[in-house]
Design a protein with these regions (language model features):
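Hydrophobic residues in alpha-helical segments
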Residues: 13, 49, 88, 129-130
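Alpha-helical elements of Rossmann-like donor-binding domains used by nucleotide-donor carbohydrate transfer enzymes
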Residues: 4, 8-12, 82-86, 121-125, ...
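Hydrophobic helical membrane-anchoring modules
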Residues: 103-153
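Alpha-helix C-terminal capping segments
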Residues: 13-16, 38-41, 65-70, 123-129, ...
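Conserved donor NDP-sugar-binding/catalytic core segment of glycosyltransferases
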Residues: 4-35
Length: 153
């Protein structure tokens, strides 16, 4: 991880009057080998985020003095995504800092690698948290899954 991650993001937040920032991130293997990267492309907007979670949790810095304290949902794998969507719905701006300041370790046995859990939680996210109807929730899971597949190619 970039040693100056926090100071870089906090300085960006001060200069841009931002209360929430996120960055792109590198993906490393269990053996610390660089195997890819996730490059977010812009500030988060609800219409884009609902289709693809491009904010890595470990890249986020939030000013809790300005953004009310929110709790993660009880979802096992989509709890961060649910929070980003909630903040966007409530009118908060999620600002992108175009730098790679974090590495995320991809692990074969992690909870986030369990595809069935992720699909189940994605459906719950759309149906219960976003209040979409059953058909729209299934459609949204398919779109989310397709976008995830494209990101992993």
């Amino acid at each position: 991880m970039e040693k100056k991650k926090l100071s870089v993001q906090i300085n960006f937040m001060k200069k841009n009057f931002s209360n929430f920032t996120f960055t792109s991130y590198n993906i490393i293997s269990e053996n610390d080998k660089h195997i890819g990267k996730r490059n977010a492309i812009k500030d988060a907007e609800y219409k884009d985020m609902i289709k693809s979670n491009y904010i890595g949790l470990s890249t986020v810095v939030i000013n809790l003095k300005k953004i009310k304290k929110f709790k993660f949902s009880n979802l096992k794998t989509q709890e961060d995504f649910a929070l980003w969507l909630l903040l966007l719905r409530r009118g908060y701006k999620l600002n992108y800092l175009n730098q790679f300041l974090t590495s995320w370790r991809k692990s074969k046995n992690s909870l986030s690698s369990n595809i069935f859990q992720k699909i189940s939680d994605a459906f719950k996210l759309y149906y219960l948290h976003e209040n979409k109807n059953f058909i729209i929730s299934i459609y949204s899971v398919l779109i989310l899954s397709f976008n995830k597949l494209i990101k992993n190619l």
